[in-house]
Design a protein with these regions (language model features):
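Residue-level detector of anion-binding/catalytic polar loops
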Residues: 37, 107, 184
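Asp-based, Mg2+/Mn2+-dependent phosphohydrolase catalytic module
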Residues: 1-7, 42, 102, 115-116, ...
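Conserved SAM-binding loop
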Residues: 16, 90, 108-111, 167-168, ...
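Gly/Ser/Thr-rich helix-start
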Residues: 15, 50-55, 94, 110, ...
Length: 221
């Protein structure tokens, strides 16, 4: 389906790695520090893709317009910074997927809404990312996804035309950004979403239930 592709770009959390345990732990520590009971990790998991907003929403029912949100957010960031590599791992099949891309000589990179403060040290700490051509964070350009600017910056950095790139993500904003950047788009219907989640209205070029299925779309192996 994507035989003419020269590069693959990925979202990070929920697409390549499962960071929900560390994100949830950072928020839950804030509860226990205040004498509140711990919440089960399963409560945090569905909102892991929403970052601090999602985690504080679960932990405290707090929305971004709350007068203390910025204070709580920075505390959450400090907690997460201290634990972000403790329980985070690649989704099943991702290590093999990346190995196949490397073997085929396809360039690949990451475009995430995670700020560089976290995205850069996290990816440096994981061997999975040693062959990534670029890591673009949510604050690398003036705009985050769903704006296409981060994807276009990633394509520019690796020297591949956007039309020759595939972007893979697990959120509708990923598909919106990819389409706006004129890239092929793939919805990752695994990870945080689960196989029962309906992604049809995202209008991605394709949907995958496992990382291996991306190789099939790329006509690999």
């Amino acid at each position: 389906m994507f035989a003419s592709v020269d590069a693959v770009m990925f979202d990070l959390d929920g697409t390549l790695i499962d960071s929900a345990p560390d994100l949830g732990a950072a928020a839950d520590q804030m509860r226990t520090d205040r004498g509140l009971p711990s919440l089960p990790p399963a409560d945090y998991r569905p909102m892991a893709g929403a970052g601090a907003r999602g985690m504080l929403g679960v932990a405290f029912g707090m929305a971004p317009d709350h007068h203390d949100f910025e204070i709580f957010k920075e505390e959450f960031f400090r907690n997460y910074e201290a634990c972000m590599t403790q329980r985070t791992y690649a989704f099943k099949g991702v290590v093999d997927l990346i190995a196949q891309l490397d073997q085929a000589g396809l360039k690949w990179g990451v475009v995430t809404n995670k700020s560089e403060r976290f995205a850069l040290p996290l990816t440096r700490a994981m061997a999975l990312f040693k062959t990534a051509q670029t890591i673009v964070g949510g604050d690398t350009t003036p705009h985050a996804k769903p704006h296409p600017a981060p994807l276009l910056e990633a394509a520019r950095r690796i020297g591949v035309a956007p039309e020759k790139c595939v972007y893979v993500g697990d959120d509708e904003r990923d598909i919106i950004a990819g389409r706006a950047a004129r890239m092929f788009t793939v919805a990752a219907a695994y990870g945080y979403l689960g196989v029962t989640h309906d992604t049809a209205h995202w209008k991605a070029d394709a949907t995958i239930q496992t990382p291996y299925q991306l190789l099939q779309l790329l006509r690999m192996p």
